[in-house]
C-alpha cells in the first residue's frame, strides 16, 4: 500500500509538472492534471490539499532536477575561465534548441506569473533555486581563478536570465551567443 501511495503521488506530481511547464500554473486545472495522471480530481485532493500545495511539490521536484542538471553540466566543464563560460552557454543554447517547445526557465516563468503575489511560497522556492544556481556558478568561477567570482556570477546570471527571456521572445540563439560574448569579457577582467 505504501509503495502504491508513493507511486500515485509521484504520478500526480509528474502530471502537474508537465501541465505547469506547458500551460503555466494558472492555466492548469486540477481536473486536467487528474486526467493526465489517470486519476480523479478527488484523488488529487486526497494527496494535496490545494493546487498551491501541488505546485510546491512540483517545484521541489523541479529544483532537484535542476540541481542534477547543474551537477551534470559541472562535471563536463573545463577548468579554464573562457572554456567554462563557453561550456555554460553552449549548454544553455543546447537546452533551448533541442527541447521541444522550449519556454525558458520554469522558475522564472512562474515568478512572472505570480508577480502579483509577492508572498507566495512558490516564489521563495524559485528564489532559493536561482540562488543555488548563482552560488554554483560562483564556485566554478572561483575554481577557475576568476577575480570577484561572486560578483561575476551575479552578472552572468543577469546575462543568462536576459538571454533566456529574449530567446523565448525572438527565437534562435543570437541572444545566448551575445550573452556568452559579454560573459567572456567579464571573466577576462582582472
PLM region descriptions:
Residues 60-66:
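Short, basic, alpha-helical segments at the C-terminal edge of helix-turn-helix-like DNA-binding modules
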Amino acid at each position: 500500500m505504501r509503495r502504491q501511495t508513493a507511486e500515485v503521488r509521484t504520478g500526480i506530481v509528474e502530471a502537474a509538472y508537465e501541465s505547469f511547464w506547458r500551460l503555466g500554473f494558472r492555466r492548469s486545472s486540477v481536473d486536467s492534471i487528474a486526467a493526465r495522471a489517470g486519476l480523479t480530481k478527488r484523488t488529487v485532493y486526497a494527496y494535496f490539499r490545494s493546487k498551491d500545495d501541488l505546485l510546491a511539490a512540483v517545484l521541489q521536484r523541479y529544483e532537484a532536477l535542476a540541481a542534477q542538471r547543474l551537477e551534470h553540466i559541472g562535471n563536463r566543464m573545463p577548468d579554464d575561465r573562457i572554456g567554462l563560460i563557453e561550456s555554460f552557454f553552449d549548454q544553455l543554447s543546447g537546452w533551448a534548441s533541442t527541447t521541444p517547445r522550449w519556454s525558458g526557465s520554469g522558475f522564472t516563468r512562474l515568478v512572472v506569473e505570480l508577480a502579483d503575489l509577492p508572498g507566495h511560497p512558490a516564489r521563495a522556492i524559485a528564489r532559493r533555486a536561482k540562488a543555488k544556481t548563482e552560488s554554483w556558478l560562483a564556485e566554478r568561477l572561483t575554481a577557475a581563478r576568476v577575480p570577484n567570482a561572486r560578483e561575476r556570477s551575479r552578472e552572468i546570471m543577469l546575462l543568462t536570465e536576459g538571454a533566456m527571456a529574449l530567446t523565448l521572445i525572438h527565437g534562435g540563439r543570437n541572444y545566448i551567443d551575445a550573452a556568452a560574448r559579454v560573459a567572456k569579457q567579464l571573466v577576462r577582467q582582472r
